[in-house]
Amino acid sequence: MSAKDQNPSPSSVELPLSRSVGYQIRTTHRLIQRYLQLRIHPHRVTLGMWYFLRVLWNEDGLTQRELSNRVGAMEPTTLSAILSMENRGLVKRVRDSHDRRKWNIFLTSKGRKLKDLTLPLAADVVNEAVAGFSEQEIDLLLKLLGAIQSNIGARLDEFDTQD
């Protein structure tokens, strides 16, 4: 087999959107996001806030950098979300007692209360997304998505070590 056969030219590669795992995951993610936004909107929570609140409900008091890493957001994006949530009275920033350069982000009582109001709505969105699936199918779906994440995560790590 020649090198040409092993590396087809870009124009000869076919990947219909219906067979593109990335495209299908992205489309599914966007639909779930849109539906979730509609469900949580009455509580004046944006999707941008939602991702940070979800992390803080489990790990209150993280630094801005830790919060960025957990959510997978750039630090300027995180700061913007924090300031917005702070203005809404959902979080407060407190200087780190060990390193005055860092801020720890803590939920306020108002921010904690949102968990009981919005988390059931998110659970409903997920349940509606997998309506008609058996528990085994849901387990398989989660296993396959986890494998994709591991595969791509390993490739990203390879790029990170090349720098």
Indicate residue ranges for each PLM-predicted region.
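Alpha-helical initiation/capping and key positions within long helical/coiled-coil segments
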Residues: S20, Q24, T77, F106, ...
